[in-house]
Each structure stands twice: as structure tokens, then as C-alpha cells.
UniProtKB/Swiss-Prot annotation:
The modification N6-acetyllysine is found at residues 289, 911. Residues 1-457 are annotated as: Helicase-like. This is DNA repair endonuclease XPF. Changing residue 786 to F: In FANCQ; disruption of interstrand cross-link repair activity; no effect on protein stability. Residues 470-483 have a biased composition (Basic and acidic residues). Catalytic component of a structure-specific DNA repair endonuclease responsible for the 5-prime incision during DNA repair, and which is essential for nucleotide excision repair (NER) and interstrand cross-link (ICL) repair. Pfam families: ERCC4. Keywords: Acetylation, Chromosome, Cockayne syndrome, Disease variant, DNA damage, DNA repair, DNA-binding, Dwarfism, Endonuclease, Fanconi anemia, Hydrolase, Isopeptide bond, Magnesium, Nuclease, Nucleus, Phosphoprotein, Repeat, Ubl conjugation, Xeroderma pigmentosum. Acetylation at Lys-911 by KAT5 promotes interaction with ERCC1 by disrupting a salt bridge between Glu-907 and Lys-911, thereby exposing a second binding site for ERCC1. Deacetylated by SIRT1. Its cofactor is Mg(2+). The keyword Ubl conjugation applies. Its EC number is 3.1.-.-. It comes from Homo sapiens (Human).
């Protein structure tokens, strides 16, 4: 990974012992594999891809992302596989897709394309060897992937279906979730492989990496801020429960509020009644989100960034007049005081009286107050420094291991990686000062005081902060001593260090390093930061003088556009030392597999975590939730009753039966004594773009054939006369605002006798187009209800259907089609917005026809007769009033039209003045 040299391409490691066992079981019997996060669901999928990369096979892969597909193809290319998987996208024309399928091998295709190809028999269903499903926890009944699997099983009884997922927690929601997923997958077997599985645990224990847990203590001000935020969170949760007694109390606990999925949990409960909630409840939900962000910023970033966020929150509240109640709590005051105390110190303020301090700070914020900068360093930074120094010391004596080891530092996101890079290259003081200048440029006097103070006190503080005991017996005593922080001192506390004690640093070296840190110019650090990889060669940094030979890479754990970027770095660099600056469960497991796949090669993992913090609690909660999810799955598996016909390899599986005819349906006995009639097969013409929704799947399930074509007018053609335009609520509002719906209604009304607007809404997310107030307040040009009313007035033949779900829509379509002729796909395809091929449009131009309909006395009933008698507007103007009466069949309408055409503008103006 040195500059100028291309990255080494390393093939994926061979399967581990327990993975081989699972593959053998899965080869024997199809099933759903649920493994723990990070334990290699992607490795299992890759192995099955490798097995079927042959022209004699045809294997479809569902639910993969483009980045994952590219990664798998590249890995197979490195392995030397000749018949590589191919990707079927919109770039491949529909006519050439059949040839791609018949060439065999592994096919990555989007769900929409596969659905269309199955329905049009463009894919040879009987030749498909099997289907591999990734992220199987997402396979619900109405999704596209379930539709594909159902079509596959209806046409192919021999092919295999194997599904993989590493998200056990997803099965924890709903009733019998895993059983419903297995039903949609048409599999009978459930394979559970948690981390505590006997085979997994025993194998990984034999090859476990050396782990050094470093529990970093937060500074007193950080602890005070964390306590204040937790108090405010607790108060907000109590108030939320008070305003909404129906909410589940267990899920709204403080422990869950700290975890990552809390936002989804609370929205899950509140979405069905969101439009009914008061402003207070909505404000509380927003406050909870902000407070969770504050907790993350506290442990993740520096003191300046945290204070900047706090001050911006308060400024926003003042600017927009919003009233967040938590800002006026005592805990909020404590949080602001301690956040400011981490950045600067006001000499005149007395810490004994909190209220006076806050008042003084508020008053003096706008004045030229002489502040003494404190710029408290992040304790994890100093812990990272200690780790890097230890690695340097070991690398000096690493000849037995084949030379110095590479170092990989992993942090949560790009921003943290950027800060770590700046900290390593500039040093804490220079980096924080530069950040302070960017954020608070006005306080130039505070910088001068701080620089003077730091130069006087620098050597004494740095010596003490880096001091380590010489013998191991004094380690506990030294740690205890380090926990007590005095005024003006910011020290690192290592409460647990499983490693060799380092030798005492030379005082002169530290002083020299510190001076060089401060003298580093902020401009010397490049501003542009790579988002996916940060390469930092620490040998050029005079502040530390460590890692002269090996390369140090700082990489984000989350947020990369390539999900396998970190995996690539891990296998290409092959680091001997990995520093986990932030705890992330998936990557911890990935490191275990990485170590187990390289037996004999050392790997040391430094685990940096704030002891007793919300960060630690989040990590432990994630572990506990996954363990509980697997325990629940084990209990469900033990009591699960799986029918023999579940796999659908014969005709006895009822899930493969189409149609909804039941025994209690009334029969018309007037027709041949009630004998069963062989009616025509129902069909609906569906626009290609509609296959992104679940409605086509449900229509097909009801026994109605689907003909997918690209329609320009309408989304669904139910009969030769009935055209349906489907809109969701958000789409409806957007189409009404930009005028697109008006144009669509014009086209539908022109070419179909029964144009229909279908408005489909989600039952779990109710909505209200009108408020609870009086109706007259809603009548306006901007109101949705008013626009819908105008639309119906403009198009009298337009019918509006309201459906609470796609299931209800499918049932409604079936009822609308009863005893009606079937639509013709070729005719529907020929209709375009400018089409003139229909019988009604062969004689008349749409433009003049619309113009004619806007004239007084002309309506939809007499318009056709009028156009039949006159060729153009000029002929119409030449007709007398009697002739118009005979054509229109109504004297009043004829008089209105005649007066409109022949009355001059001057006469109209004079009549208007006369009325006044």
C-alpha cells in the first residue's frame, strides 16, 4: 500500500471449519441461514457463487447491491474463474436478455427485470438451476423477491433456493416473522449459527487474536455532560409516555434510547397516529433525536465541535422562536457550563454559583471578554498515543516476526478519521487551536492568553500525562493515581491495560516533541480528506517519531460507498496491529475470522472504549439484543411446524395456487343450472415502471394475468375502456403541485371512456388532507382538497378511488373487471400522449377539440355532433343561430355559442359599464 505501488489483490480466504460444515448441510438440503453479524454470510454466498460459475448452470442472485456484485466478481476474477457472473441491468435490451440467460452461469439481475422476464417467459424457467437470496430477512409476502420466488416455483419444481442473512434482530419483530419468511422462500430448513454456537465458539477460541482492552476514563467535565444529557433524555421519555399512554413502556427505556435503532422504534409506534399527535409530542421526538446526537458528539469528537453544536442549537432556538423545554432544565444549564469549561475559562466567574455563572456567560458572550483557553483534549487521543508508542517499541524488536507490523486504526466515520489524522500529524494542541480559530474567530485575545499559559505549563503537564510505572506491580497504583484529575490538568486514565508496561520516556524528547507539535503550521496539513481511506505515514511526524518503516492507515467503519472497502484494506495491508478507536460489533467479528483464516500470523487488537459510558452501553446492548434474538429463534425453531409441501416441489402447496374463488361464492343458477362456466382468463396491462411496487405481485396472486408493457398513458389498463393512474399520497401532492396530474387526466380522458385516479395510502401511516378546523379555512388555491375538487370539475368522467393498501387495490381491480372484456396490450402500447390512432381521434385534432369544449354552450354531449358538421373554427363562425340550434339540439346552448362568437369586444365592455 505504499505510494506509487498498486494495491495487492488477494483472494478471499478459504472457508473455515464451521463454514465448511454449514456449506455441506446447505448443499444437502435447501434452507435459510441466519448467522451472527460479521460471521461471514457474504463468504457463504461467495462460495456458492464460485460453485455455480459454469455454463452448465443458471443461478439467479437476488437482493444484492451493485458494490457487492462488483466485489464478488473481482474476487472470482482473482481466483481465476473463467465464466464470471454477469449483471443484467436496463442497459441490456429486452430482446437480448434471453441470450444472456441461455449462456448459463451466475446472473445478478434487478428484481424488476426478473419479474418482467418471468411474466413474459423471456427467461427459460425450466433451465434455472437455482436461486440464491441475500438479506433474506427482507423477504415479506408482497415484495418483489417473494414474487420472483413464487413465479420460479410455479414454473420450476426442481431448482434449489438457498437464502442467507446476518440480521437475527430483524426476526425479533412481528408474530412468527421467521416462519413467514421461510414460507415466502419455499424452504423447510432453518440453519442458526450464532456466535455462541458450539462449533463456531470452539474454532474461533483456538485462533483468537490477542486483545488489549483499554477502558479510557472520561474527564470530569465529560462525565458531568453525559449525566446531564441522560437526565434530560429521561425527562423527555417520561413526558412522551405521559402524553402517549398507549406506547410500549419497555421499548421507551433509557437503555434503548441510547441504542442506534431507537429512532426506528419510536417512529414504528408513532407513525400510525402521527397526523393526530400534538405539537408537544412531535417536538419531544425531535428533542430525543437531538439529545442522542449530543451523546454521540460527546464521545466521538473534540470539545470545540461539541460546544459549537450546543451553541448552534441555542442560537437556532432563539432565531426561530422554538421552545424546547429541555433547554430550560437545570441539567441543560450544567451541560452548557461544562461544555464551555472544556473550551475556555472565564477568570472572573465563580464556579460555586451555577446560576450566576450562566448569567455572566450569557451577558459576556457578545463583549470583548478576556478568556483563558483550556481546549480539553479527548482522552482517547492520548490513549491512542500510548498505543502507538507501544507499537513502535515492539516494532524495534520485531525481527523474529519478519519486520515491523502494519497498523490499521478504525474509527466510526469519516469525520472522526479526519480528526485523528489531524491529531497525529499536528498534535492535540495545534489541532484544537486551529479548530477553535475556525469556529470562534472573534476570540483572538483568548488565543494569546492560552498560548502563553501553555508555554509556561507545557513541560510539567506532558511529563505527568505520559508517565508510566517501570515495574508491573505499580500499574494498579499508577492507574488509581491517574484517575484523580486536578485543576488545569487533563490526563489519560488507563483503567485496564492488558499489555507490557512501556519504559519511561525521556523528558527531553517529550519537550522537543511538544515544541514541534506547536510549531506545526495548520496549513501544513492538507485540507482535502479522502472519504474512504486515510493514509498517514507517521515516520515524517517529528512529534512522535514512531512507525518509521510501516504504514499506518486510518479507515472509517461506517459510511463508505463501498461496503467492502474495509475488508479490502484488511486483506491487502494485512496489519499486525489493529486499533479499534470505536466499538463496532460487525468488524470485531470480522477480525476474528481474519485471524482464524491466517493461522500462525500474529494479530493484536487494541480496543479503546470509554469505561462506564453510553458508548460502552451501546456496544453491550447490541450484543445482548443479538443474543436474545438468537435465543428466540432457537425456541421458535423447536416449536415450528413445517408442512411437507413447503418447498413447493409438487402441486399441493397452496401458496402456489392462484385465484381467490371460494366455496361460499354464490352461483348464478339461471345459466345452465349453475354449472361451472369456463370463463376467459382475466388479464391486466401494466406499465413497466409499476413493477417497483408490490401491487402487480398481489394482482397476479389473485389469478389475473399480467402483461407488462411500457405505457405512456395510465399505469393499469383494466378493460378497453378503463384506464387507471395510480398515485401514492406523496406522489399525488407533487403531481398536483407541478401540473403533471392534470396532463395525465387530459390524456386518459381523451383516449378512454372511464379514466380512474387511484389514490393508494399506507394503513400504517394514516393521513389527513384537511385539518380539524372549519372547512372554509381550507378552500384555497394551495390546498390539496381544493385542487382535487377542481380536477373533478374539470374532468366530469374522472373517477377517484381511495385504497388503504395494495391488497385492497388488487381486490378492487378484480371486482371492476368482472364481466368486462379484456384489454389489448398492443392497442394500449400504441396510445401515446400525442397519439391519433384511435377511432375517436382519427377525425378530430385534440387541440381544437379542447378549445371547442371551453366555449359557452358546448359540452361533452354536443361536442361530437358539432365537430361532425364543421371542419374548423372558421366554418363554425359562419353558421347562423338557427343552424347551431339544429346541430346542438338546444336553443339556449346555440344562443350562448352564437353570442360568444359574434359579440364584439366593445359591446362586451359597454354592457359591463351599463351593469355598473
Amino acid at each position: 500500500m505504499e505510494s506509487g505501488q498498486p494495491a495487492r489483490r488477494i483472494a478471499m480466504a478459504p472457508l473455515l471449519e464451521y463454514e465448511r460444515q454449514l456449506v455441506l448441510e446447505l448443499l444437502d438440503t435447501d434452507g435459510l441461514v441466519v448467522c451472527a453479524r460479521g460471521l461471514g454470510a457474504d463468504r457463504l454466498l461467495y462460495h456458492f457463487l464460485q460453485l455455480h460459475c459454469h455454463p452448465a448452470c443458471l443461478v439467479l442472485v437476488l437482493n444484492t447491491q451493485p458494490a457487492e456484485e462488483e466485489y464478488f466478481i473481482n474476487q472470482l476474477k482473482i481466483e481465476g474463474v473463467e465464466h464470471l457472473p454477469r449483471r443484467v441491468t436496463n442497459e441490456i435490451t429486452s430482446n437480448s436478455r434471453y441470450e444472456v440467460y441461455t449462456q448459463g452461469g451466475v446472473i445478478f439481475a434487478t428484481s424488476r427485470i426478473l419479474v418482467v422476464d418471468f411474466l413474459t417467459d423471456r427467461i427459460p424457467s425450466d433451465l434455472i438451476t437455482g436461486i440464491l437470496v441475500y438479506r433474506a430477512h427482507r423477504i415479506i409476502e408482497s415484495c418483489q423477491e417473494a414474487f420472483i420466488l413464487r413465479l420460479f416455483r410455479q414454473k420450476n419444481k426442481r431448482g434449489f433456493i438457498k437464502a442467507f442473512t446476518d440480521n437475527a434482530v430483524a426476526f425479533d419483530t412481528g408474530f412468527c416473522h421467521v416462519e413467514r419468511v421461510m414460507r415466502n422462500l419455499f424452504v423447510r430448513k432453518l440453519y442458526l449459527w450464532p456466535r455462541f454456537h458450539v462449533a463456531v465458539n470452539s474454532f474461533l477460541e483456538q485462533h483468537k487474536p490477542e486483545v488489549v482492552e483499554i477502558h479510557v476514563s472520561m474527564t470530569p467535565t465529560m462525565l458531568a455532560i453525559q449525566t446531564a444529557i441522560l437526565d434530560i433524555l429521561n425527562a423527555c421519555l417520561k413526558e412522551l409516555k405521559c402524553h402517549n399512554p398507549s406506547l410500549e413502556v419497555e421499548d421507551l427505556s433509557l437503555e434503548n434510547a441510547i441504542g442506534k435503532p431507537f429512532d426506528k422504534t419510536i417512529r414504528h409506534y408513532l407513525d400510525p397516529l402521527w397526523h393526530q399527535l400534538g405539537a408537544k409530542t412531535k417536538s419531544l421526538v425531535q428533542d430525543l433525536k437531538i439529545l442522542r446526537t449530543l451523546l454521540q458528539y460527546l464521545s466521538q469528537y473534540d470539545c470545540v465541535t461539541f460546544l459549537n453544536l450546543l451553541e448552534s442549537l441555542r442560537a437556532t432556538e432563539k432565531a426561530f422562536g422554538q421552545n424546547s423545554g429541555w433547554l430550560f432544565l437545570d441539567s441543560s444549564t450544567s451541560m452548557f457550563i461544562n461544555a464551555r469549561a472544556r473550551v475556555y475559562h472565564l477568570p472572573d466567574a465563580k464556579m460555586s454559583k451555577k446560576e450566576k455563572i450562566s448569567e455572566k456567560m450569557e451577558i459576556k458572550e457578545g463583549e470583548e471578554t478576556k478568556k483563558e483557553l483550556v481546549l480539553e483534549s479527548n482522552p482517547k487521543w492520548e490513549a491512542l498515543t500510548e498505543v502507538l508508542k507501544e507499537i513502535e517499541a515492539e516494532n524495534k524488536e520485531s525481527e523474529a516476526l519478519g519486520g515491523p507490523g502494519q497498523v490499521l486504526i478504525c474509527a466510526s466515520d469519516d469525520r472522526t478519521c479526519s480528526q485523528l489524522r489531524d491529531y497525529i500529524t499536528l498534535g492535540a494542541e495545534a489541532f484544537l487551536l486551529r479548530l477553535y480559530r475556525k469556529t470562534f474567530e472573534k476570540d483572538s485575545k483568548a488565543e494569546e492568553v492560552w498560548m502563553k499559559f501553555r508555554k509556561e505549563d507545557s513541560s510539567k503537564r506532558i511529563r505527568k500525562s505520559h508517565k508510566r510505572p517501570k515495574d508491573p506491580q505499580n500499574k494498579e497504583r499508577a492507574s488509581t493515581k491517574e484517575r484523580t484529575l486536578k485543576k488545569k490538568k487533563r490526563k489519560l486514565t488507563l483503567t485496564q491495560m492488558v499489555g507490557k508496561p512501556e519504559e519511561l520516556e525521556e523528558e527531553g524528547d517529550v519537550e522537543e516533541g511538544y515544541r514541534r507539535e506547536i510549531s506545526s503550521s495548520p496549513e501544513s496539513c492538507p485540507e482535502e480528506i479522502k472519504h474512504e481511506e486515510f493514509d498517514v505515514n507517521l515516520s515524517s511526524d517529528a512529534a512522535f517519531g514512531i512507525l518509521k518503516e510501516p504504514l499506518t492507515i486510518i479507515h472509517p467503519l461506517l459510511g463508505c460507498s463501498d461496503p467492502y472497502a474495509l475488508t479490502r484494506v484488511l486483506h491487502e495491508v494485512e496489519p499486525r496491529y489493529v486499533v479499534l478507536y470505536d466499538a463496532e460489533l460487525t468488524f470485531v467479528r470480522q477480525l476474528e475470522i481474519y485471524r482464524a483464516s491466517r493461522p500462525g500470523k500474529p494479530l493484536r487488537v487494541y480496543f479503546l472504549i470509554y469505561g462506564g459510558s453510553t458508548e460502552e452501553q451501546r456496544y453491550l446492548t447490541a450484543l445482548r439484543k443479538e443474543k436474545e434474538a438468537f435465543e428466540k429463534l432457537i425456541r421458535e425453531k423447536a416449536s415450528m411446524v413445517v408442512p411437507e409441501e413447503r418447498e413447493g416441489r409438487d402441486e399441493t402447496n397452496l401458496d402456489l395456487v392462484r385465484g381467490t374463488a371460494s366455496a361460499d361464492v354464490s352461483t348464478d343458477t339461471r345459466k345452465a343450472g349453475g354449472q361451472e362456466q369456463n370463463g376467459t382468463q382475466q388479464s391486466i396491462v401494466v406499465d413497466m415502471r409499476e413493477f417497483r411496487s408490490e401491487l402487480p405481485s398481489l394482482i397476479h396472486r389473485r389469478g389475473i394475468d399480467i402483461e407488462p408493457v411500457t405505457l405512456e398513458v395510465g399505469d393499469y389498463i383494466l378493460t378497453p375502456e378503463m384506464c387507471v393512474e395510480r398515485k401514492s399520497i406523496s406522489d399525488l401532492i407533487g403531481s398536483l403541485n407541478n401540473g403533471r396530474l392534470y396532463s395525465q387526466c387530459i390524456s386518459m380522458s381523451r383516449y378512454y371512456k372511464r379514466p380512474v385516479l387511484l389514490i393508494e395510502f399506507d394503513p400504517s401511516k394514516p393521513f389527513s388532507l384537511t385539518s380539524r378546523g372549519a372547512l372554509f379555512q381550507e378552500i384555497s388555491s394551495n390546498d390539496i382538497s381544493s385542487k382535487l375538487t377542481l380536477l373533478t370539475l374539470h374532468f366530469p368522467r374522472l373517477r377517484i378511488l381511495w385504497c388503504p393498501s395494495p391488497h385492497a387495490t388488487a381486490e378492487l381491480f378484480e371486482e371492476l373487471k368482472q364481466s368486462k372484456p379484456q384489454p389489448d396490450a398492443a392497442t394500449a402500447l400504441a396510445i401515446t400522449a400525442d397519439s391519433e390512432t384511435l377511432p375517436e381521434s382519427e377525425k378530430y385534432n385534440p387541440g381544437p377539440q379542447d378549445f371547442l369544449l371551453k366555449m359557452p354552450g358546448v359540452n361533452a354531449k354536443n361536442c361530437r355532433s358539432l365537430m361532425h358538421h364543421v371542419k374548423n373554427i372558421a366554418e363554425l363562425a359562419a353558421l347562423s343561430q338557427d343552424e347551431l340550434t339544429s346541430i346542438l339540439g338546444n336553443a339556449a346552448n346555440a344562443k350562448q355559442l352564437y353570442d360568444f362568437i359574434h359579440t364584439s369586444f366593445a359591446e362586451v365592455v359597454s354592457k359591463g359599464k351599463g351593469k355598473k
